[in-house]
Amino acid sequence: MLINLYRYCISPFIPARCRYYPTCSEYALEALKTHGILKGLYLTTRRLLRCHPLSKRDYYDLVPCKNKKG
């Protein structure tokens, strides 16, 4: 998976800069695991677009729970 490639081959060589907990790569893995490929990619993309120095968001940004109907 591309996220694991980034985490183990690229991330160790660049300074930690993620503004959130969990990190963006951890968030992406959890979002994909919890919500599947489509919603997981949507949530990950939204998160990456918010992760920048001018962001006014809270430090904690957790993957939303999966809604169960019924």
From Swiss-Prot:
InterPro entries: Membr_insert_effic_factor_YidD
Compartments, record wording: Cell inner membrane
Keywords: Cell inner membrane, Cell membrane, Membrane
UniProt key word Secreted: no
A Pfam family assignment: YidD
Family assignment from sequence similarity: Belongs to the UPF0161 family.
Membrane topology annotation: Peripheral membrane protein
Primary role: Could be involved in insertion of integral membrane proteins into the membrane.
Presence of keyword Nucleotide-binding: no
Protein name listed in UniProt: Putative membrane protein insertion efficiency factor
A GO cellular component entry from the record: plasma membrane
